[in-house]
Every structure is written in structure tokens, then in C-alpha cells.
Regions:
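N-terminal accessory segment detector
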Residues: 1-137
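Short, hydrophobic/π-rich interface segment
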Residues: 138-189
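C-terminal edge-of-domain segments
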Residues: 191-196
């Protein structure tokens, strides 16, 4: 465990904020103020872009773990609330896709570059929580596997399948990849494909 902030902690915090902003985008589109306030009271948002302002430096790992859990559970809670209100998954996916299109254009010259971009953006728990690896790489396709799906526990807590999360993730990444003419597909919840 680290006793001081290192680049990996800022990298993780950026990923947490990206996930939180997706939740906010969905909330803004579909929830009224009272419903947003309820989500905030149950699962308070991180209020600063500056990690040093908010983190408990005496418990860096524990604080980051709690922040990951909080952003994941809030997202699952909001999605369940929307589905219960009759908002279609397709409509929620449109918001996720649009959020993906808001990212700046990065230097992507290969499928490996696209994969590395995803590793910098997607929140899959702390590095100690998950193992992700490329299992197949060809000229026009790169397949990777997520060995420990941390999202499942949060969606299951609200009686949803992890596949709901992965459909939303697919929409978000396809929004992100639109400017590169790349596609992202869930083969199954644990296997992902990036293709030209």
C-alpha cells in the first residue's frame, strides 16, 4: 500500500471521475431534481477534480476502493431507477454513446493504441481487483478478456444482470471510437472485441 500519492493514484482517480460523469449525464437526461438529490444523498459524488483535495492520504488505497465502489453503486442505482420508470435501455445507451463522443481525439494509429486508451478511460476497479489481457490480436481485430467483472456485484445488488452494464459500456465506447472508425463489441460480458 502506498503512503504517498503516485501517478497510478491520479490515473485511477481520472477513471473514477470519467465513470461519475457518465452517471451524471444519464441523471441529467432522465431524472428530475428530486430524484438526482436522492441519488446524491444515498451515494455522494466526488466534488473535486483535484485528488489531493479529497483523498485521505493516510489511507490512499482504502479511499480509492471506496470511491470506486461508490461510483459503481450509484451508476447501478440510477440505471435501475430509470428502467423501473420505463426508460428504455436503448434510450440510456444513446446518452452513453453521446458522452463517449465528447472526449478529445487521441493519437490512435493501431488497435493496440485503442486498447490502451480504453485501459486509461474505463473503470474496472483498482488494478489489484481485476485482470485484463489481450487474447487475440490480428490486423483488423483485437480481443481482450476481463477476468474479474467487478460491475456484476453492483448490478446484481439491484436485481439486474451484468449484461445491462456491458451494453451501456459498449454504447459509451462506440461513441468514443466513432471518430476513429473503430467498433467495440461485447462478445460475452467478459470478452470484448475492438475492430476496424
Amino acid at each position: 500500500m502506498s503512503a504517498f500519492l503516485a501517478p497510478i493514484h491520479f490515473w485511477m482517480y481520472d477513471k473514477i471521475l470519467i465513470a461519475q460523469k457518465l452517471t451524471f449525464a444519464v441523471e441529467e437526461k432522465f431524472l428530475n431534481k428530486e430524484e438526482r438529490d436522492e441519488a446524491e444523498s444515498l451515494f455522494p459524488a466526488l466534488i473535486s477534480e483535484d485528488l489531493e483535495e479529497v483523498i485521505d492520504q493516510s489511507n490512499i488505497h482504502g479511499w480509492l476502493h471506496t470511491a470506486v465502489s461508490n461510483v459503481e453503486i450509484r451508476f447501478a442505482y440510477v440505471i435501475k431507477k430509470l428502467l423501473d420508470k420505463g426508460i428504455s435501455l436503448e434510450d440510456i445507451k444513446k446518452v452513453a454513446f453521446e458522452y463517449g463522443t465528447t472526449f478529445p481525439k487521441y493519437e490512435i494509429s493501431s488497435l493496440q493504441d485503442a486498447y490502451e486508451l480504453l485501459m486509461d478511460i474505463l473503470l474496472d476497479g483498482l488494478p489489484c481487483d481485476v485482470s485484463i489481457s489481450v487474447i487475440r490480436e490480428e490486423e483488423n481485430e483485437l480481443e481482450f478478456v476481463l477476468y474479474n467483472d467487478i460491475h456484476k456485484q453492483y448490478f446484481n445488488e439491484f436485481d439486474m444482470e451484468a449484461s445491462v452494464y456491458h451494453e451501456l459500456r459498449e454504447a459509451f465506447v462506440n461513441g468514443l471510437f466513432e471518430k476513429y472508425s473503430l467498433k467495440y463489441k461485447n462478445i460475452i460480458d467478459s470478452n470484448k472485441l475492438i475492430s476496424r
